[in-house]
């Protein structure tokens, strides 16, 4: 295998590992502070830590003082405001859900967006969905049922919040996909993280969260991890990894491994356990995630069909 490809795959897998462990950090942080306090501090740190990354990349590319890059920055700022508002909804519902559900389970339910993106893309933007998308949806639905639905057709409120998070994340990805080729990726993250942090502040008071220096300092490990490693390092590894990735499908699969790492770290660190029914749901959702990202083979031409015949 090409050394560049090997390094690319390693970077993406490491990013997935960092993101998977972030579910554990988020869950632990809820023992000390409220969801909006956590979101405000984490995203402020995430935005701040990406500023030097952006400046270094701009300087290396010679765009830091380039007049032609101004329009891109302006447009990126506008898209960042929209993405930030959507991301606020996604991260807040996820954080609330993590108060009531296991980190590993939350990781897999959140990953449902991978299956939902092509479906909503077809509904909103009229993008054609392949046969494997619909099979993935069916498999994921059965997996979600086994993972979340209990006897008497009841569902934990934590799971409801995380399912809402997956749906909102779907819209976030669709917006990024729509405007991604016209924006600066790192600047977009800086803006959207800053927006999430700002929007979280009033909800700290609306939700009547007790904010104190001692509480925040108790959660400092979780905040630093999610702010610096998950946002700063994880995002940078994604940029490096995708730059030299030869196969987009493999890149997507490696990044989606965050849900698997969420279960592993939840088991190792938080001692979370899945029932046989929930584990079956995890297997089915994993299969749906993998299937949804596999490339569809090119259609054979009439000449090729005749040659085979």
Protein language model features and the residues they cover:
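Specific transmembrane alpha-helical segments of multi-pass solute transporters/efflux pumps
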Residues: 22-23, 55-110, 146, 227-245
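Hydrophobic/small/kink-forming positions within alpha-helical transmembrane segments
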Residues: 20, 24, 84, 88, ...
């Amino acid at each position: 295998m090409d050394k560049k490809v090997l390094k690319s795959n390693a970077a993406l897998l490491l990013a997935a590992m960092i993101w998977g462990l972030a579910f554990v950090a988020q869950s632990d942080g809820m023992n000390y502070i409220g969801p909006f306090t956590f979101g405000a501090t984490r995203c402020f740190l995430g935005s701040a830590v990406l500023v030097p990354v952006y400046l270094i990349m701009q300087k290396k590319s010679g765009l830091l003082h380039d007049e032609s890059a101004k329009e891109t920055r302006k447009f990126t700022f506008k898209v960042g405001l929209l993405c930030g508002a959507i991301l606020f909804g996604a991260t807040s519902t996820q954080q609330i859900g993590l108060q009531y559900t296991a980190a590993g389970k939350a990781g897999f339910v959140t990953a449902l967006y991978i299956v939902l993106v092509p479906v909503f893309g077809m509904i909103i933007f009229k993008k054609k969905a392949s046969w494997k998308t619909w099979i993935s949806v069916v498999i994921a639905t059965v997996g979600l049922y086994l993972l979340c639905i209990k006897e008497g057709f009841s569902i934990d409120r934590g799971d409801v919040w995380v399912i809402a998070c997956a749906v909102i994340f779907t819209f976030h990805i669709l917006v990024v996909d729509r405007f991604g080729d016209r924006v600066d990726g790192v600047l977009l993250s800086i803006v959207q993280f800053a927006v999430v942090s700002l929007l979280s502040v009033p909800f700290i008071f609306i939700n009547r969260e007790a904010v104190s220096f001692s509480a925040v300092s108790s959660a400092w490990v979780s905040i630093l991890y999610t702010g610096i490693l998950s946002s700063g390092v994880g995002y940078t590894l994604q940029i490096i990894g995708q730059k030299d990735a030869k196969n987009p499908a493999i890149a997507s699969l490696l990044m989606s491994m965050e849900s698997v790492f969420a279960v592993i770290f939840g088991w190792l660190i938080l001692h979370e356990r899945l029932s046989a029914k929930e584990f079956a749901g995890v297997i089915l959702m994993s299969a749906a995630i993998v299937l949804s990202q596999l490339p569809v083979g090119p259609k054979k031409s009439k000449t090729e069909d005749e040659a085979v015949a």
